[in-house]
Amino acid sequence: MRAPEDLPDDNPGSVAPYEVGQFVHDNLELYYEVHGQGPRVLVFLHGILMDANMNRRLAADLAAEGNRVILLDLPGHGLSARPQRASFHRMDTYAGHVLALLDHLGIDQAVMGGVSLGGNVSLLVAAQAPERVRGLVIEMPVLEWALPAAAITFVPLLLASHYARPVVGVVAKAFRALPRTGNGPFDSVMNMLSAEPRETAAVLHGVLAGPIAPTVDQRAAMDVPALVIGHKVDHVHPFHDAQQLARRLPQGQLIQANSVLELRVHPERLTAEINGLLDSAWSGPAGRVRRAG
């Protein structure tokens, strides 16, 4: 791994230096970042079509509290490989890449977490390899109540990426030419708008075609410290999904965010809650994520 150059001190989006690396899994080169050191590991995953930029400040803040936070760009996102076949972008396939990252870094157990897509993938990691999950941090899960709104939102994007490809391609090229700001969440949105339409279509198709979350019985078997963050702003991330997930997880705790952007714009309160979850997950014996059925 290598450390990037320090960002300017006067850049409001700057964070402490961190290490970056790549590894290959299923013939795909995947990019990751490691913030901080030590045995208290959190893997935190980005939302759909976003990348590690959106969570970099959170990673730095948690690293300053003695945690090791790992950010992974999933296939089709950020600096990782961008295969244009939908089969590469199923959420359960993404979960396999996360487990391969733990193997690559020699990590036996980690707290798993993420926002939206990343939260769902974290739940699938817990279902696939329960012995490796120490706890869960799930921000804005997309579960049963979200499906109609998610379909209404993403199916038009998928169709536009297929059938309006020349127009979308021109827009993406224009965004690629724009300088990045150093503000992680804003740059993550710019990177999303810069993607080639075939890449975007493959991600959306794969995510919509495959399983989006573990079964209800599998969720009920995840007996580890779990923090669920929800909000009441948009229908793609309905607060009811967050409520139901927190109730279903044996150790689930629900926190209501003040807005969809609180953890990115005014992160102090929620960052403290996440650090408290990490304290609980790593302070005693490991909980149990059982294999349902």
What are these regions (language model features)?
Residues Q251-G293:
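Catalytic active-site module of serine/aspartate enzymes centered on a nucleophile-bearing elbow/loop
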Residues L71-G113:
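Active-site loop/oxyanion-hole signature of alpha/beta-hydrolase fold enzymes
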